[in-house]
Amino acid sequence: MQRKYFFTSPPLKMPELPEVEEAMLRLRAAVEGRTIARVRTHHASHQRQLPAAAARRLRQQKIVRVERRGKHQLLHLENGSTLHAHFRMNGDWMMSRTDQPLEKFTRASIDLTDGTRIELHDSRALSSMKLHGKGENPLPKLGMEANDESLDADYLRDALSKRKGPIKPALMDQAVIAGLGNIYAAEALWRAKINPRAVSSSISRARLVKLAEAIHSVLDNETRAPGRYTDTENRDRFQVYDREGMACSRCGSKIRRIPQGGRSTYFCPICQRS
């Protein structure tokens, strides 16, 4: 069997809702209804997250359901426990066979009884894999899914009404909107013509209507055309992200980059004045 990433090689950078959704769907097709032979961890941080004793409890467990919540992937097992995975900055799944050697950056691996192996591949070792017992909630507090049709101006107004900080980091807070990250938050703000430094609670309802529409539009486009973003690929598919110094497609001004919350924010200083 030829080893293959679920996305691209090298792995995608900064997976957000569309990428994690596709990863979950491919993972579901590969493992749902199948039985785990063993789970191993191959990096110190992952060994702390999933100790050997916990990994042993996964043996001969049938994977009954795979789902996504925000950027989290959940493998629900026959005994009621849940294996919880998160890609963080640049994780990816890789499919191989149990008789093949592990890749250099494989941080955890799931061997199935049919000989299939799913590897959690992550060059920066920031990804995670944890086991949660029956009845335990594996998830942190999460807001509404970014692709939920109910996400509208009223939801955004309520979620942002007490926030005095800038809108861009607020949109990336998973307790506000689950699944939205740095790339698509920047793209949605550009479409809605909202300055990323605008105070969250001060944005008018009319702008929030535009913002909700922009979030749905950006994610719909990415879901329909899921080419994966890396440092050197697919830059032209974005309007502002990673386009510092390039011309805004709407007004021709140069895209700017500013630091916000330890991340780079890209925006048009003319289109996004408000």
Name every feature range the model reports, one short phrase each.
Residues 2-274:
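Structured catalytic/nucleic-acid-binding cores of DNA maintenance enzymes
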